[in-house]
């Protein structure tokens, strides 16, 4: 149940008036949500207990002695027309929520999913996860010196629920009541507690200052930065070109356990480049400092340059204990041409991973098949257990028998680029779906040719798509490849205006609400949502709820594996590949201070050693 139920005919002005008045109403309601039996603590975890005890001095991967100073320059492909990435409109970097604003809780990169109190000095959560409360740190201040209050938290909550991206709208919409019994305490009632990740989602909201934020225009694109409580402030914006952040000298949490050894640069600048080639050339020229490399050809051959030989650039390989997500060519199943699962499976058989990996990518990729590869969450090679079968019992046939048994695996070719057996199997599936090959053209029952477009946004994507299109042409399928800029690309994705795209869904050690955004039926028709494949499956919806409601680790693993099997059975993507490690290149003098976290790369660790010369 939503906190505000608005009449369908209510004007936009009326909505905004209610947004403005809602925090005042909840302040007046008093405290009735959380029982006194739920004590304040320093952290909450999705499963198990937090690793760090109360009173810890700093994160275990951070080094409080790291020197501070200098400038870090980050390079980004594309452009931007806004500073607010929390709404559907516009293309915006994540710099403001990440460095200018703060959240009630801060996620540790050393644990699967544990969040420690940041703006909140304490958090209370009952055992059933139906009631949640935060006590705001009395020291917490926005950059204008005004304190962070419960009113700011409620204002942020209502604004994101009403005007944020679909993820926040759907997640926060599950809250049944919010109240502020005091200026420093805010309480949430979370319905039946079935979404056990919801407390962590609420804790991760970037908090806006009510007195400095216009709720009426929040959903629009804007270059006006949010007033934040974080370690940096926006110093300069050059629309579409660059964004400069400078350290705040009056940052309230300079000596907080969650910031010691982090946020080490005095300045952080984001520079934007039109395409991937320009971005790479700029890095080799020393124009920015940190590059995550995802192109094997570049990693293997592109760094054979003087800057690497003389030490101005160094390459590092990092390994994290995080499942590897899915990179695939995504079918937009809203298109009639991709509505039949047999068609989708057939097209998957025609991707020659063995040839592509050897000839285009130096053999460094592993074949993707699961959405949670290299982890115990993956269903590949693992037969379903009683827990999984119980979750899937109400949906007979939703998972194929070979996938249920753990014997299915992505197709393997002979690596020739012309595997006749794979082509034969694919044609059989296409014929079963109603297609016939006539005079070299694959046609449906209406004699319409099988043709579609792959939309790409980079040259490496284009190269792969053209290779795949050539493979499909051998079965009479006409595929065009269109390369467009980032702004057009994101607009088309937001409206699901594409046939096929290449996409990567990152995985975490604790998948949760983001999976609803990716696969939930309600998000299949919601513009701006991440359900690009258009998945509409009662079985998927049911398993997603089981995943979010799991109390024990065994039940959680079973739910994730059941989800994996359902997605594999749906053949919503042509599985491509993944890298087992993370490749990073750093300019001389730029380091990941402290030690590498266990689960993901934390940019907050980056530091420039005092003797190093910054990028221009």
Identify the residue ranges that each predicted region occupies:
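Extracellular/periplasmic solute-recognition and catalytic clefts
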Residues: 177-179, 235-246, 271-335, 342-346, ...
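Aromatic-rich, solvent-exposed beta-strand/loop patch
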Residues: 117-121, 143, 148, 172, ...
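Detector for C-terminal structural segments
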Residues: 15, 22-23, 38-40, 76-78, ...
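Gly/Pro-rich hinge or "lid" segments in bacterial periplasmic/extracellular proteins
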Residues: 79, 101-113, 158, 202-262, ...
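Aromatic- and charge-enriched surface segment that lines or borders ligand/interaction sites
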Residues: 62-67, 89-96, 122-166, 181, ...
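Surface-exposed binding/hinge segments that line
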Residues: 135, 169-214, 231-238, 383-395
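Ligand-site clamp/hinge motif
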Residues: 137, 220, 253-304, 345, ...
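N-terminal lobe/hinge region of extracytoplasmic solute-binding protein
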Residues: 36-128, 135, 158, 227
């Amino acid at each position: 149940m939503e906190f505000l139920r608005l009449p369908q005919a209510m004007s936009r002005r009326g909505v905004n008036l209610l947004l403005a008045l809602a925090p005042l109403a909840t302040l007046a309601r008093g405290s009735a949500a959380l029982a006194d039996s739920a004590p304040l603590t320093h952290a909450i975890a999705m499963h198990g207990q937090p690793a760090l005890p109360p009173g810890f001095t700093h994160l275990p991967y951070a080094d409080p002695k790291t020197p501070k100073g200098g400038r870090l320059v980050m390079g980004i492909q594309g452009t931007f027309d806004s500073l607010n990435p929390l709404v559907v409109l516009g293309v915006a970097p994540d710099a403001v929520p990440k460095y200018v604003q703060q959240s009630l809780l801060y996620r540790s990169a050393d644990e699967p999913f544990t969040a420690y109190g940041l703006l909140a000095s304490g958090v209370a959560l009952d055992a059933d996860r139906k009631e949640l409360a935060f006590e705001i740190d009395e020291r917490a201040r926005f950059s204008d010196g005004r304190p962070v209050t419960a009113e700011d938290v409620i204002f942020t909550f209502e604004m994101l629920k009403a005007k944020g991206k679909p993820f926040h709208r759907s997640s926060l919409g599950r809250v049944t009541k919010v109240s502020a019994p005091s200026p420093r305490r805010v309480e949430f009632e979370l319905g039946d507690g079935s979404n056990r990740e919801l407390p962590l989602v609420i804790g991760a909201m970037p908090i806006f200052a009510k007195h400095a934020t216009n709720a009426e225009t929040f959903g629009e694109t804007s270059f006006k930065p949010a007033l934040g409580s974080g370690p940096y402030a926006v110093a300069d914006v050059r629309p579409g070109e660059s964004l400069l952040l400078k350290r705040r000298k009056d940052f309230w949490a300079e000596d907080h356990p969650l910031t010691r050894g982090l946020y080490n640069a005095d300045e952080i600048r984001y520079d934007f480049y039109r395409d991937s080639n320009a971005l790479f050339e700029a890095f080799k020229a020393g124009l920015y400092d940190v590059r995550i490399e995802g192109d094997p050809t570049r990693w293997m051959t592109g760094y054979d340059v003087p800057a690497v030989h003389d030490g101005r650039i160094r390459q590092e390989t990092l390994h994290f204990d995080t499942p590897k997500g899915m990179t695939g060519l995504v079918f937009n199943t809203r298109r009639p041409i991709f509505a039949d699962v047999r068609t989708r499976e057939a097209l998957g058989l025609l991707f020659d991973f063995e040839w592509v990996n050897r000839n285009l990518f130096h053999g460094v990729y592993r074949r993707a098949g699961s959405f949670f590869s290299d982890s115990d969450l993956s269903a590949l090679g693992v037969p379903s257990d009683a827990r999984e079968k119980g979750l899937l019992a109400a949906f007979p046939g939703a998972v194929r028998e070979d996938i249920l048994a753990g014997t299915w695996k992505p197709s393997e070719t002979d690596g020739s680029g012309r595997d006749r057996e794979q082509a034969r199997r694919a044609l059989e599936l296409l014929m079963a779906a109603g297609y016939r090959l006539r005079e070299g053209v694959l046609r449906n029952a209406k004699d319409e040719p099988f043709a579609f477009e792959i939309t790409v946004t980079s040259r490496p994507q284009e190269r792969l798509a053209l290779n795949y299109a050539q493979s499909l042409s051998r079965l009479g399928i006409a595929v065009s490849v269109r390369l467009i800029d980032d702004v057009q690309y994101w607009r088309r994705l937001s409206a699901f205006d594409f046939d096929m795209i290449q996409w990567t869904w990152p995985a975490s050690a604790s998948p949760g609400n983001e999976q609803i955004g990716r696969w939930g039926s309600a998000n299949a028709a919601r513009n701006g949502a991440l359900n690009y494949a258009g998945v509409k499956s009662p079985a998927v919806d049911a398993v997603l709820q089981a995943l979010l409601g799991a109390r024990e680790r065994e039940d959680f693993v079973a739910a994730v594996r059941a989800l994996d099997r359902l997605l594999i059975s749906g053949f919503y993507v042509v599985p491509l590949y993944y890298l087992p490690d993370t490749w990073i290149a750093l300019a001389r003098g730029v380091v990941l201070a402290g030690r590498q976290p266990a689960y993901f790369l934390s940019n907050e660790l980056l530091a420039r050693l005092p003797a190093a010369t910054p990028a221009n």
